[in-house]
Structures are given as structure tokens and as C-alpha cells.
């Protein structure tokens, strides 16, 4: 029975997730849903930029052989298509949070995906709807909140706490006893030393080295990371 939907349509995210699923799960995929406006793309022009045509785009309301639905009021579609389980891979943590609230009301199961190469060092707690890409390391007694996306090559050391609906981009390294708040975005190749606290809704720019705590709703960048501005 094809009773699984995926929220999110980008080849850089959803495409990778579908590619990582085993055959059994792929056969159960029903459709793609997005709460975001789907941009109009000149596919021929895009393929000229990359002649091997490896990037996939929505064509005739389909991608990866699955129908695509763009709608903020998605509950009706889920019911009509008899969807019982979903992966949620929309762009931002706030969007994922809003979708989670609706899905919980409808009692639709929110699925997690943890790649087989991920190393879990024990006594870990992992929330609902978490997606962890290949070659990540989750240290002893570290916890991950709901709706977190952890991209490839992240190393989260022991006794860390990652809040709900965070986006952790590739090759993040944290020291022990680090705490990252809810709705944070940590960009590519960031290093965070031991016992750092990063507040809710904060962002850290690419390649930064975090040596000091970061308050709520702040953007920090650099080596060492310094305050840039309040995060909108």
C-alpha cells in the first residue's frame, strides 16, 4: 500500500532522501507535498548548465515519478490519498514545526530516517521526524529533538543537547556538553568548543569557530565567531 508522503520537493534534499530509502520504503511512496510556492523553472536552460541532466525538476506536476501537490491546507490531500505516514523535509525548522502540529492533530505518523552509516554511541534520545544523513557521529548520552535535520559528516560529541527543529549542515563538529537551542541553523564546517550554549532561533555562519555562548535570535560568523546582527 502506497501510504507515505514526503513534504519538500527539492532535489538537494528530498531527492537525496528518496535515494537513501530502501526499496521497500520507496515502493510505499505516494506523493510529494510542499507548503512552499513551487518556482517556475526553464528545465532546458537548467540542463544546459549541467549537460548530464542529473538535477531533477518538477515536470507535469511530477518528480521522481510521484505526483506533486503544492498547498498550505494539505490535510484534505492527505485524507483523499489515504496517507498514514510522512517524512517532513521542508526548508526551515519553523515550517517543519507548523506541519508537525497539523499532522499530530490528524494522528498521522511522522517518520524519521537515520542512515545505516550513522554511529550512535549509546544512551541517545532521538525525537520524531529526525533525518540524519550518512557518516554522522552521535556521542554518548547526546540527545536530538523533534524535526531536526543533520546533514552528512556531522560529529556531535558526548552529552550534547540539540533542540527541536534545528538544521545542522555538513561537517559540523561540537565539543562535549554543548547545547544548541530550538530552531537553530548551523551552517557548513562549523566548529563549536566544549560547553557552549547557543540560544533559540540563532544562526552560525559557514566555517565559524564558536568559542563563546550565543544568545537567542543572533547571527554569529567568523573564526572566532563574532556577533553580526540580530537574527530575524
Predicted regions and their residues:
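A solvent-exposed beta-alpha-beta segment
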Residues: 1-84
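Cofactor-binding loop segments of dinucleotide-utilizing enzymes, especially the Rossmann-like FAD-
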Residues: 9, 34-37, 91, 115, ...
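Short alpha-helical
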Residues: 12-13, 94-95, 209
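Short amphipathic alpha-helical segments
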Residues: 17-19, 98-102, 144, 216, ...
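Parallel beta-helix/beta-solenoid
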Residues: 127, 144-145, 163, 181, ...
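Glycine-rich hexapeptide-repeat left-handed beta-helix
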Residues: 152, 169-232
